């Protein structure tokens, strides 16, 4: 019984760590994106998650909700995880950049890619999340995440699905960001890209089983 209690207490301490990080990040002003973002969008998921998914930055829906991957790309991601046989409860989701970078276009807020300064300013938060969660696998979603975590020279279009050696986790790889699937020009193209995306996720699931 004592061992069980110690495990529970250790898990509670770990949870407090991520909660503290979230509270600290809420007031982050390391770059200027806080001036136009509604709020900091920190990572979400259990401390015991075995898989960490890292995207580029929150989108419009995420910025308003204060939670990552709750918009259309998040819905597509949830579907792909389910089809790949990955339990969503075992996944921690976050982004390299914690504020929504955008430009106005009419009444809409359109995504803008974060620059190197903004990415560098946010990297300590991501590193802290990785240290707290200690995932077995990290999946970078899109080129921004892959180049920030794996290598500035990483090409998702060429190297997607390949495992790379990293001190961050036992398994580290990259695939496309789900938003890129939504932007595919035809239904057929979307179907094909979705299938490839699911295949990439399935490969991770088989590796960590």
Predicted stretch roles:
Residues 2-209:
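A polyanion-binding, active-site-adjacent surface
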